[in-house]
């Protein structure tokens, strides 16, 4: 419904930014809840909460980080992703990943935890015809030019000059069928 109402790009940006904010909040909470454990034990609270909240299963493939040095590399395999399963139920297999909120969450979580902008990108996705979703995260600078499209989805629309006007949103909503 969000995609039909707002369009693919605006919906993606909205979901990604919502996920990012949720991730930053959960990272703050993980630091408090696991304050007496190792940094790695603190960090893995995020993927554990991902599962406990019913979002999907998150299996670490590789996780290396050093907060003091600002180094981070994370790679996770996601299965049974609710967000993705809903997407493929309503849209055909395509060329773009669709776990927008969860990638935003991973980026926000890692960024808050590391104190440095970390970008997770979905490099394989069920909505692209793969068997599972795979994400890779590292500092934005380490991605180079590859990061630009994904970073756009983390920025407020007004900063991109793409904020839809109220008239445009009203026009889109006017063509939707009324709920009975």
Model segments located where?
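N-terminal accessory segment detector
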Residues: 1-101, 115-180
């Amino acid at each position: 419904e969000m995609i039909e109402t707002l369009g693919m790009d605006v919906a993606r940006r909205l979901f990604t930014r919502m996920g990012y904010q949720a991730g930053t909040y959960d990272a703050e909470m993980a630091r408090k809840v696991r304050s007496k454990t190792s940094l790695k034990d603190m960090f893995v609270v995020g993927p554990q909460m991902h599962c406990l909240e019913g979002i999907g299963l998150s299996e670490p493939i590789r996780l290396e980080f050093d907060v003091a040095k600002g180094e981070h590399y994370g790679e996770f395999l996601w299965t049974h992703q609710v967000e993705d399963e809903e997407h493929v139920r309503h849209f055909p297999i395509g060329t773009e990943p669709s776990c927008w909120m969860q990638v935003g969450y991973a980026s926000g979580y890692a960024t808050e935890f590391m104190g440095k902008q970390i970008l997770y990108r979905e490099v394989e996705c069920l909505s692209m015809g793969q068997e599972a979703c795979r994400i890779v995260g590292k500092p934005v600078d380490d991605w180079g030019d590859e990061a630009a499209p994904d970073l756009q989805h983390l920025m407020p629309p007004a900063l991109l000059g793409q904020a839809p006007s109220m008239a445009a949103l009203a026009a889109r909503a006017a063509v939707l069928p009324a709920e009975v």
